[in-house]
Amino acid sequence: MKKFTLTLLLIFGTVSALFAQQSVREDIFAFLKCEGYVPTFDEDRDILFKVQGINYYAIIKEVADMDYAYVEVSANFTADVLYDKLLAISNDQNRDKFVCKCSAERDGEDNCFKVAMEFITNNRTNTEYQMAHALRLLPGRIEKFKEELD
């Protein structure tokens, strides 16, 4: 009986986490459409949308054994700049910044940078608030990063 009860609890937890993830994904998609963006899904079911001609991704991940989802809203770029310079710019941009973060990475031969905001959410109100906040902050952070590249 204990095994049966434990199995039911595990199944319920997994199903509720999947519903939470799906709900957050639907909330973000609906919010973006309502704000006038044209969101689509990529091959991983991440949400892709454009802001001022720049591709943004909303990546939703379930948090095991919890009733919330982790969301990363980001824009990725390839830069014809030395990796060390990208890393220095990222570190400089991240000083005294707590919400939007910049990172540098190597992708094979390419040097790349990413500007992202992360949050956790478990309801539509919080999801919409955080997405609006991301859409306010990220374009400015991206612009500042690009200015440093010149």
Role assignments for model-derived ranges:
Residues 4-15:
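Sec-dependent N-terminal signal peptides
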Residues 72-112, 116:
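Short, internal acidic amphipathic alpha-helical interface segments
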Residues 25, 29, 83, 87, ...:
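Extracytoplasmic/secreted envelope proteins and their assembly/folding machinery
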Residues 15-21:
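Sec/Tat signal peptide C-region and signal peptidase I cleavage site
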Residues 102-139:
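A short, solvent-exposed beta-edge/loop patch
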Residues 92-96, 127-150:
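Ampiphathic alpha-helical segments that act as solvent-exposed interaction surfaces
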Residues 30, 34-81:
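Ser/Thr-rich, low-complexity intrinsically disordered terminal regions
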